[in-house]
């Protein structure tokens, strides 16, 4: 695990305060999210799946999703819609808004032609805001070859043979 990138204390504090005002959370929710933002590896803060996060911190799916939606609203995270190839774990596109998604695409990795199905090949993910913590995955030109091809370009919910992505 690499050394965590620095945190903008002011923005983190403001965001957590706004998040705490958004609704009443269980007592451990905001301290656990703060710990996650401060100490997680850069890759763990890139394209976070709120359901997976919730299972790690004993938070229901509904509460985990609500936490990340509110966290995006207050600027702690940014929400993205990822278009995933149906045949490999390639992220074919990352969109802030669904109206940018085209009905058909060709995968740059496996060359397969894909018809977009919103319920099957779209993932909603959250990445820590660059103002809060500027992770290396926001700078793909600085990634190692392995990180660029196997972590940046692939969905972290897929796998490539024996290599977990």
Task: Give the predicted meaning of each segment.
Residues 2-76:
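N-terminal alpha-helical interaction blocks
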Residues 115-165:
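Long, charge-rich boundary regions
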Residues 91-93, 113-114:
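Cys/His-rich microdomains that often coordinate metals
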Residues 70, 82-86, 98:
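Amphipathic alpha-helical "recognition" segments
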Residues 83-89, 107-110:
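Short cysteine-rich clusters marking metal-coordination/redox-active sites
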């Amino acid at each position: 695990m690499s050394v965590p990138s620095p945190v903008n204390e002011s923005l983190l504090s403001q965001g957590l305060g706004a998040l705490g005002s958004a609704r009443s959370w269980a007592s451990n929710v905001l301290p656990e999210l703060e710990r996650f933002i401060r100490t997680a590896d850069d890759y763990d803060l890139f394209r976070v799946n709120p359901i997976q996060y919730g299972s790690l911190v004993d938070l229901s799916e509904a509460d985990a999703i609500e936490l990340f939606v509110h966290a995006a609203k207050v600027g702690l995270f940014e929400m993205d819609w990822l278009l995933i190839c149906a045949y490999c774990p390639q992220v074919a596109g990352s969109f802030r808004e669904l109206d940018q998604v085209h009905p058909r695409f060709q995968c740059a990795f496996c060359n397969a032609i894909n018809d977009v199905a919103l319920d099957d090949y779209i993932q909603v993910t959250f990445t820590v805001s660059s103002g809060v913590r500027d992770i290396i995955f926001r700078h793909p030109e600085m990634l190692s070859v392995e990180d660029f091809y196997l972590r940046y370009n692939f969905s972290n919910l897929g796998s490539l043979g024996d290599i977990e992505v």
